[in-house]
Amino acid sequence: FPTRRSSDLFRISSQGIIYPVYKGFYVIIPPHYAAKRMVPPIYYIDQLMSYLNKPYYISLLNAAEIHGAAHQRPQKFSVMSVFPKSSVSQSKNNTLVWVYRKEIPTDFLLSKNSETGVIYYSNAELTALDIVQYEQYIGGLSRASTILEELTEKLDFRGASNKLFGYTSIATIQRLGYILDEVLNAAEIADTLYMELTSYVKRFKYIPLTINKPKDCAERNNRWKIFVNTIIETDEI
């Protein structure tokens, strides 16, 4: 509503007719959302990102939810986009969690129809890598492992070294491999990931499982070259 005065927008927003999503971007509240006076992000995210003229994909727990592996419905909505960061006020819309990377791995995105058009989200393998790499946005590695446990039946890392690994870090692959191997006992998937990793890089160095704790005196996992400096516990599904 670019031609509306701010006073008019405030009035119809307070009446529950429109919902303020972003500075200058409002969504008309459909009748079936009128009681809550808000609209879920999946309803407007594609239109919002078009308005911002930025590429995106639905990521982390919300992508996992689309894959049927969220365990619990996420309280926030994670959107992956590219730098530079958008100036989004948390007070304007605190349901959106913005995560940024250098480029969007379009070859590893899936699409589906929503109420208002088409939305884009990460495929299972990219989702798995993202929830490990950006675990600070979802509550840590134990939460990531719980999601991975539900996602394993959809994971297929054959050929990942050709292109997918270029969108993440070696450390992320190591941590994901360790979790699949030692925490989730998903040996077949872990073996495939390991073969892809060793074909991608000839050698890799030891890293801590988490950067939030010291690695002194931590046990070593020789296969994935991990300092096991934290305990990962998955929730019961």
What are the residue ranges of the model-derived segments?
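Basic amphipathic alpha-helical segments that dock to polyanions
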Residues: S7-G16
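Bulky hydrophobic/aromatic packing residues
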Residues: Q15, S81, N185-E188
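Short gly/ser-rich loop at a beta-strand->alpha-helix junction or flexible surface loop bordering the NTP-binding
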Residues: I17-I104
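Hydrophobic alpha-helical interaction segments
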Residues: L109-I237
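Short, small-residue-biased leader/transition segments that mark boundaries at the very start
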Residues: F1-S6
